[in-house]
């Protein structure tokens, strides 16, 4: 049985957000770095640092929280893994789903790399739907 690194980073970020942790440490791979770059560019993550520990690289993410009048912090990050090792989900460029009418994003793995649904629609390419973020 293989290791699902995408599900691991989604779970780590979701758990840290629910527990109001400011920082998350995830293992650095090419896929995780691509996904984290998208999260940083879309504004879901404030800052990213690369950390080396015993010949292993880790990414340290600083999560963005929004203030609420009733609570000190309100969680806002919802992530859902779609395609998984046991059930791959693919979509062409016309059938890429829109999350909350375009407010959320879909992260796809395409032949031209990992990108958001907007980029894939502009380039008119489809791919494997990795996760939804809203």
From Swiss-Prot:
It is found in: Plastid, Chloroplast. It holds the Pfam family Ribosomal_S8. The keyword Thylakoid does not apply. GO terms for molecular function: rRNA binding; structural constituent of ribosome. GO terms for biological process: translation. One of its GO terms (cellular component) is ribosome. Keywords: Chloroplast, Plastid, Ribonucleoprotein, Ribosomal protein, RNA-binding, rRNA-binding. Its main location: plastid. One of the primary rRNA binding proteins, it binds directly to 16S rRNA central domain where it helps coordinate assembly of the platform of the 30S subunit. Part of the 30S ribosomal subunit. Belongs to the universal ribosomal protein uS8 family. This is Small ribosomal subunit protein uS8c. The gene is rps8.
């Amino acid at each position: 049985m293989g290791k699902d690194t995408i599900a691991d980073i989604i779970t780590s970020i979701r758990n840290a957000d629910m527990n109001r942790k400011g920082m998350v440490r995830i293992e650095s791979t090419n896929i995780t770095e691509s996904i984290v770059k998208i999260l940083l560019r879309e504004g879901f993550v404030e800052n990213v640092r690369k950390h080396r520990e015993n010949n292993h690289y880790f990414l340290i993410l600083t999560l963005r929280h929004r203030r609420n009048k009733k609570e000190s912090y309100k969680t806002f990050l919802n992530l859902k893994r779609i395609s998984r090792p046991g059930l791959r989900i693919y979509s062409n460029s016309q059938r890429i789903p829109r999350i909350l009418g375009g407010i959320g994003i879909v992260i796809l793995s395409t032949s031209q790399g990992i990108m958001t649904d907007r980029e894939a629609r502009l380039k008119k390419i489809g791919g494997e739907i990795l996760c939804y973020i809203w």
